[in-house]
Amino acid sequence: MWAQQPRFAEGLGPFSQVAQGAGYVGIEVSHLTDLGGFESLLNQSVLPVHSLHAPTPRPAAAARGLNLAATDEDERAAAVGSTVRTMDYAVRVGARFVVVHLGHISERLDEEDQLRRFFQQGRIESDEARATRDQAHRRRRELVGPHLTAAQRSLAELAEAASARGVAIGLENRLGFREIPSPEETALLLADYPPGLVGYWHDTGHLEVQGRLGLLDRQEALDSLGARILGTHLHDVQGLRDHRAPGNGESDWAYIARALPPAAVRTFEISGDEPETFIQGAIGFLARCGIL
Protein backbone atom coordinates (compact mmCIF):
# COMPACT_ATOMS: atom_id res chain seq x y z
CA MET A 1 0.00 0.00 0.00
CA TRP A 2 2.81 2.44 0.81
CA ALA A 3 3.96 2.00 -2.78
CA GLN A 4 0.71 3.58 -4.03
CA GLN A 5 1.74 7.22 -3.93
CA PRO A 6 2.55 9.81 -6.62
CA ARG A 7 6.33 9.64 -6.34
CA PHE A 8 6.28 5.97 -7.38
CA ALA A 9 3.72 6.45 -10.16
CA GLU A 10 6.28 5.97 -12.93
CA GLY A 11 7.41 2.58 -11.66
CA LEU A 12 8.00 0.59 -8.51
CA GLY A 13 11.75 0.23 -8.91
CA PRO A 14 12.34 3.40 -6.86
CA PHE A 15 9.94 2.08 -4.21
CA SER A 16 12.02 -1.09 -3.96
CA GLN A 17 15.15 0.97 -3.40
CA VAL A 18 13.51 3.01 -0.63
CA ALA A 19 12.20 -0.16 1.00
CA GLN A 20 15.59 -1.85 0.86
CA GLY A 21 17.24 1.23 2.33
CA ALA A 22 14.81 1.09 5.27
CA GLY A 23 15.74 -2.53 5.96
CA TYR A 24 12.96 -4.45 4.23
CA VAL A 25 13.92 -7.69 2.50
CA GLY A 26 10.96 -8.48 0.22
CA ILE A 27 7.76 -7.18 -1.33
CA GLU A 28 4.09 -8.07 -1.39
CA VAL A 29 2.42 -6.73 -4.53
CA SER A 30 -0.80 -4.95 -3.55
CA HIS A 31 -4.15 -5.50 -5.26
CA LEU A 32 -4.02 -1.75 -5.97
CA THR A 33 -1.06 -2.24 -8.35
CA ASP A 34 -1.94 -1.80 -12.02
CA LEU A 35 -0.34 -3.74 -14.85
CA GLY A 36 2.22 -1.03 -15.55
CA GLY A 37 3.34 -0.96 -11.94
CA PHE A 38 3.50 -4.73 -11.86
CA GLU A 39 5.63 -4.88 -14.99
CA SER A 40 8.01 -2.32 -13.49
CA LEU A 41 8.53 -4.66 -10.55
CA LEU A 42 9.63 -7.36 -12.95
CA ASN A 43 12.35 -5.03 -14.20
CA GLN A 44 13.85 -4.41 -10.76
CA SER A 45 16.27 -6.76 -9.06
CA VAL A 46 16.48 -4.94 -5.74
CA LEU A 47 14.03 -7.01 -3.68
CA PRO A 48 12.30 -10.36 -4.27
CA VAL A 49 8.51 -10.62 -4.44
CA HIS A 50 7.31 -12.90 -1.64
CA SER A 51 3.55 -12.63 -2.11
CA LEU A 52 0.82 -11.25 -4.35
CA HIS A 53 -2.45 -9.86 -3.03
CA ALA A 54 -5.28 -11.01 -5.30
CA PRO A 55 -6.49 -9.67 -7.62
CA THR A 56 -3.09 -8.54 -8.91
CA PRO A 57 -2.42 -6.78 -11.22
CA ARG A 58 -5.49 -4.61 -10.65
CA PRO A 59 -8.16 -5.78 -13.10
CA ALA A 60 -10.34 -3.66 -15.34
CA ALA A 61 -13.08 -1.69 -13.59
CA ALA A 62 -15.76 -4.25 -14.45
CA ALA A 63 -13.83 -6.98 -12.63
CA ARG A 64 -13.04 -5.05 -9.45
CA GLY A 65 -14.89 -6.07 -6.34
CA LEU A 66 -15.87 -9.48 -7.68
CA ASN A 67 -17.15 -11.61 -4.84
CA LEU A 68 -15.79 -15.13 -4.28
CA ALA A 69 -18.77 -15.70 -1.99
CA ALA A 70 -21.35 -14.46 -4.50
CA THR A 71 -24.54 -16.46 -4.82
CA ASP A 72 -24.63 -15.42 -8.48
CA GLU A 73 -22.68 -18.19 -10.21
CA ASP A 74 -21.38 -16.01 -13.04
CA GLU A 75 -19.89 -13.50 -10.61
CA ARG A 76 -18.43 -16.22 -8.41
CA ALA A 77 -16.81 -17.97 -11.37
CA ALA A 78 -15.40 -14.67 -12.64
CA ALA A 79 -13.93 -13.97 -9.20
CA VAL A 80 -12.26 -17.39 -9.21
CA GLY A 81 -10.84 -16.72 -12.66
CA SER A 82 -9.45 -13.36 -11.56
CA THR A 83 -7.74 -14.97 -8.56
CA VAL A 84 -6.27 -17.78 -10.66
CA ARG A 85 -4.86 -15.08 -12.93
CA THR A 86 -3.03 -13.71 -9.89
CA MET A 87 -1.63 -17.19 -9.22
CA ASP A 88 -0.24 -17.27 -12.74
CA TYR A 89 1.51 -13.97 -12.10
CA ALA A 90 2.83 -15.35 -8.80
CA VAL A 91 4.48 -18.18 -10.70
CA ARG A 92 5.92 -15.66 -13.13
CA VAL A 93 7.61 -13.61 -10.39
CA GLY A 94 8.54 -16.56 -8.17
CA ALA A 95 6.20 -15.58 -5.33
CA ARG A 96 5.26 -18.36 -2.93
CA PHE A 97 2.00 -16.93 -1.55
CA VAL A 98 -1.24 -15.47 -2.88
CA VAL A 99 -3.31 -13.54 -0.34
CA VAL A 100 -7.06 -13.92 -0.89
CA HIS A 101 -10.17 -12.05 0.21
CA LEU A 102 -12.76 -14.82 0.19
CA GLY A 103 -15.78 -12.58 -0.32
CA HIS A 104 -18.67 -11.13 1.62
CA ILE A 105 -22.36 -11.20 2.38
CA SER A 106 -24.13 -9.12 -0.25
CA GLU A 107 -26.28 -7.21 2.25
CA ARG A 108 -24.79 -4.43 4.33
CA LEU A 109 -24.79 -4.80 8.10
CA ASP A 110 -25.79 -1.32 9.22
CA GLU A 111 -25.23 -2.33 12.83
CA GLU A 112 -21.48 -2.14 12.25
CA ASP A 113 -21.78 1.49 11.16
CA GLN A 114 -23.71 2.20 14.35
CA LEU A 115 -21.01 0.50 16.42
CA ARG A 116 -18.42 2.77 14.82
CA ARG A 117 -20.48 5.77 15.86
CA PHE A 118 -20.75 4.42 19.40
CA PHE A 119 -16.96 4.01 19.49
CA GLN A 120 -16.35 7.57 18.33
CA GLN A 121 -18.79 8.82 20.97
CA GLY A 122 -17.08 6.83 23.74
CA ARG A 123 -20.17 4.65 24.16
CA ILE A 124 -18.90 1.31 22.86
CA GLU A 125 -19.52 -0.33 26.27
CA SER A 126 -23.04 1.07 26.59
CA ASP A 127 -26.21 -1.03 26.75
CA GLU A 128 -27.18 0.31 23.33
CA ALA A 129 -23.86 -0.82 21.86
CA ARG A 130 -24.22 -4.28 23.39
CA ALA A 131 -27.71 -4.62 21.92
CA THR A 132 -26.40 -3.48 18.54
CA ARG A 133 -23.59 -6.05 18.65
CA ASP A 134 -26.08 -8.80 19.47
CA GLN A 135 -28.23 -7.74 16.54
CA ALA A 136 -25.18 -7.67 14.22
CA HIS A 137 -24.31 -11.25 15.17
CA ARG A 138 -27.92 -12.39 14.69
CA ARG A 139 -28.20 -10.81 11.25
CA ARG A 140 -24.86 -12.21 10.12
CA ARG A 141 -25.86 -15.73 11.19
CA GLU A 142 -29.12 -15.39 9.26
CA LEU A 143 -27.45 -14.19 6.07
CA VAL A 144 -24.10 -15.97 5.84
CA GLY A 145 -25.18 -19.53 4.92
CA PRO A 146 -25.47 -19.37 1.11
CA HIS A 147 -22.47 -17.05 0.85
CA LEU A 148 -20.31 -19.35 2.97
CA THR A 149 -21.32 -22.28 0.75
CA ALA A 150 -20.27 -20.28 -2.31
CA ALA A 151 -16.99 -19.34 -0.63
CA GLN A 152 -16.27 -22.99 0.14
CA ARG A 153 -16.81 -23.88 -3.50
CA SER A 154 -14.54 -21.05 -4.64
CA LEU A 155 -11.82 -22.09 -2.21
CA ALA A 156 -11.96 -25.69 -3.44
CA GLU A 157 -11.40 -24.51 -7.01
CA LEU A 158 -8.65 -22.11 -5.97
CA ALA A 159 -6.88 -24.77 -3.90
CA GLU A 160 -6.80 -27.07 -6.91
CA ALA A 161 -5.34 -24.28 -9.05
CA ALA A 162 -2.79 -23.35 -6.38
CA SER A 163 -1.65 -26.94 -5.98
CA ALA A 164 -1.10 -27.23 -9.72
CA ARG A 165 1.04 -24.08 -9.68
CA GLY A 166 3.03 -24.71 -6.52
CA VAL A 167 1.75 -21.67 -4.65
CA ALA A 168 -0.05 -21.38 -1.31
CA ILE A 169 -3.23 -19.47 -0.48
CA GLY A 170 -3.41 -17.18 2.54
CA LEU A 171 -6.99 -16.45 3.64
CA GLU A 172 -6.98 -12.95 5.09
CA ASN A 173 -9.20 -11.83 7.96
CA ARG A 174 -11.13 -8.78 6.87
CA LEU A 175 -12.01 -5.38 8.30
CA GLY A 176 -15.77 -5.54 7.74
CA PHE A 177 -18.07 -7.72 9.84
CA ARG A 178 -19.99 -8.91 6.77
CA GLU A 179 -16.78 -10.22 5.22
CA ILE A 180 -16.02 -13.93 4.98
CA PRO A 181 -14.49 -15.75 6.74
CA SER A 182 -14.93 -15.01 10.43
CA PRO A 183 -12.35 -16.66 12.72
CA GLU A 184 -14.71 -19.60 13.29
CA GLU A 185 -15.38 -19.92 9.56
CA THR A 186 -11.65 -19.73 8.85
CA ALA A 187 -11.00 -22.72 11.11
CA LEU A 188 -13.79 -24.64 9.38
CA LEU A 189 -12.44 -23.87 5.91
CA LEU A 190 -8.81 -24.64 6.74
CA ALA A 191 -9.69 -28.07 8.12
CA ASP A 192 -10.20 -29.33 4.57
CA TYR A 193 -6.68 -28.48 3.34
CA PRO A 194 -3.06 -29.21 4.23
CA PRO A 195 -1.24 -26.32 5.94
CA GLY A 196 1.20 -25.84 3.09
CA LEU A 197 -1.57 -25.30 0.54
CA VAL A 198 -4.15 -23.14 2.32
CA GLY A 199 -3.48 -21.19 5.50
CA TYR A 200 -4.42 -18.10 7.45
CA TRP A 201 -3.05 -14.64 6.63
CA HIS A 202 -3.31 -12.59 9.80
CA ASP A 203 -4.09 -8.88 9.38
CA THR A 204 -3.28 -7.23 12.71
CA GLY A 205 -5.19 -4.00 12.10
CA HIS A 206 -8.36 -5.67 10.90
CA LEU A 207 -8.55 -7.88 13.98
CA GLU A 208 -7.76 -4.90 16.20
CA VAL A 209 -10.64 -2.84 14.80
CA GLN A 210 -13.10 -5.72 15.11
CA GLY A 211 -11.98 -6.13 18.71
CA ARG A 212 -12.38 -2.44 19.48
CA LEU A 213 -15.96 -2.65 18.22
CA GLY A 214 -16.52 -5.60 20.57
CA LEU A 215 -17.38 -7.97 17.73
CA LEU A 216 -14.77 -10.56 18.73
CA ASP A 217 -12.10 -11.38 21.27
CA ARG A 218 -8.78 -10.56 19.61
CA GLN A 219 -6.56 -12.93 21.54
CA GLU A 220 -9.01 -15.81 21.39
CA ALA A 221 -9.42 -15.39 17.63
CA LEU A 222 -5.68 -15.24 16.98
CA ASP A 223 -4.82 -18.11 19.31
CA SER A 224 -7.42 -20.34 17.62
CA LEU A 225 -5.72 -19.88 14.24
CA GLY A 226 -2.08 -19.42 15.24
CA ALA A 227 -0.92 -22.84 14.10
CA ARG A 228 -2.24 -22.19 10.57
CA ILE A 229 -0.70 -18.75 10.03
CA LEU A 230 1.28 -18.55 6.80
CA GLY A 231 1.83 -14.80 6.87
CA THR A 232 0.78 -11.46 8.21
CA HIS A 233 -0.20 -7.92 7.34
CA LEU A 234 1.36 -5.81 10.07
CA HIS A 235 -0.06 -2.36 10.73
CA ASP A 236 -1.15 -0.25 13.67
CA VAL A 237 -4.49 1.35 14.53
CA GLN A 238 -5.36 4.85 15.75
CA GLY A 239 -8.91 4.79 17.05
CA LEU A 240 -10.57 2.88 14.20
CA ARG A 241 -8.12 4.05 11.55
CA ASP A 242 -5.96 1.15 10.44
CA HIS A 243 -2.92 0.83 8.17
CA ARG A 244 -0.85 3.11 10.40
CA ALA A 245 2.85 2.29 10.65
CA PRO A 246 3.62 -0.04 13.57
CA GLY A 247 4.35 2.22 16.51
CA ASN A 248 2.04 4.97 15.25
CA GLY A 249 -1.04 3.65 17.03
CA GLU A 250 -2.33 1.97 20.16
CA SER A 251 -2.30 -1.73 19.24
CA ASP A 252 -1.24 -4.33 21.81
CA TRP A 253 1.58 -6.21 20.10
CA ALA A 254 2.44 -8.52 23.00
CA TYR A 255 -0.29 -11.09 22.39
CA ILE A 256 0.47 -11.03 18.67
CA ALA A 257 4.15 -11.74 19.30
CA ARG A 258 3.22 -14.76 21.41
CA ALA A 259 0.96 -16.21 18.71
CA LEU A 260 2.95 -15.74 15.50
CA PRO A 261 4.89 -18.80 14.29
CA PRO A 262 8.55 -18.02 13.59
CA ALA A 263 8.18 -19.05 9.94
CA ALA A 264 5.17 -16.82 9.22
CA VAL A 265 5.92 -14.13 6.63
CA ARG A 266 6.01 -10.66 8.17
CA THR A 267 4.54 -8.17 5.69
CA PHE A 268 4.11 -4.49 6.53
CA GLU A 269 0.86 -3.12 5.06
CA ILE A 270 1.15 0.62 5.67
CA SER A 271 -0.87 3.44 4.13
CA GLY A 272 0.78 5.68 1.57
CA ASP A 273 0.07 8.74 3.71
CA GLU A 274 2.37 7.59 6.52
CA PRO A 275 5.67 9.56 6.67
CA GLU A 276 8.82 7.82 5.48
CA THR A 277 10.38 8.24 8.92
CA PHE A 278 7.67 5.95 10.32
CA ILE A 279 8.42 3.40 7.61
CA GLN A 280 12.07 3.49 8.58
CA GLY A 281 11.28 3.05 12.27
CA ALA A 282 8.68 0.30 11.98
CA ILE A 283 11.14 -2.60 11.76
CA GLY A 284 12.97 -1.57 14.92
CA PHE A 285 9.70 -1.01 16.76
CA LEU A 286 8.35 -4.48 15.96
CA ALA A 287 11.73 -6.06 16.73
CA ARG A 288 11.51 -4.54 20.21
CA CYS A 289 7.97 -5.92 20.51
CA GLY A 290 9.15 -9.44 19.68
CA ILE A 291 7.31 -9.62 16.35
CA LEU A 292 10.49 -9.82 14.25
Regions found by a protein language model. Name each.
Residues 69-199:
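Active-site acidic/histidine proton-transfer and metal-coordination neighborhood
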Residues 63-64, 130-135, 232-236:
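Short, basic/glycine-rich phosphate-binding loops at helix/coil junctions
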Residues 1-85, 91-95, 120-126, 199, ...:
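N-terminal pre-domain/capping segments
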Residues 5-20, 35, 85-96, 109-110, ...:
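Histidine-acidic metal/acid-base catalytic patches
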Residues 57, 176, 207:
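Active-site loop signature of alpha/beta-hydrolase-fold enzymes
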Residues 32, 55, 103, 237, ...:
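Flexible loop residues that form catalytic
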Residues 46-58, 152-158, 162, 192-193, ...:
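Alpha-helix-loop-beta-strand connector modules within alpha/beta enzyme cores
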Residues 1, 27-29, 49-54, 98-100, ...:
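Hydrophobic faces of well-ordered beta-strands that scaffold small-molecule active sites
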